[in-house]
A protein has these predicted regions:
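A short, N-terminal "cap"/entry segment at the start of jelly-roll beta-barrel domains
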Residues: 1-30, 110
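Amphipathic, hydrophobic secondary-structure cores in small proteins
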Residues: 49-51, 78
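Glycine- and acidic-residue-biased ligand/ion/polar-headgroup-sensing regions
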Residues: 51-62, 67
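Ligand-binding loop in jelly-roll beta-barrel domains
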Residues: 83-107
């Protein structure tokens, strides 16, 4: 197999202690997939980074804010946040996001 495989059962869930948890899935230098779980009311504080990010809602409901504009996202919805834009999310209903980053997030590997 020339591809990079990550079995969900082998990916460690890191509990942040704030109602969120991250599970780094398959990745290489150019791309990273991360499963992020949220309890209702938990949030990803507004921040910025040099990575382009795509968030896909697997379950739950989220209010996502990019550069001061908010949108509600439900299962099956997705959003792309270009590099350098301020963004954050609030979980309205317990759920899980699949976040894809390019390039990979070195800070998620520590």
């Amino acid at each position: 197999m020339k591809g990079i495989v990550c079995h969900h059962r082998d990916a460690l869930l890191k509990d942040a202690g704030d109602g969120t948890g991250k599970r780094v899935l398959a990745w290489n230098d150019q791309l990273m997939a991360v499963e992020v779980s949220f309890e209702e009311g938990a949030f990803g504080a507004e921040h910025t980074h040099p990575h382009t990010q795509c968030s896909y809602v697997l379950s739950g409901r989220f209010s996502y804010c990019v550069e001061g504009e908010s949108v509600e996202l439900a299962p099956g919805d997705s959003i792309v946040v270009p590099s350098g834009l301020t963004h954050g999310t609030v979980c309205l209903e317990k759920g899980v996001l699949l976040d894809i980053f390019t390039p990979h997030r070195q800070d998620f590997l520590g």
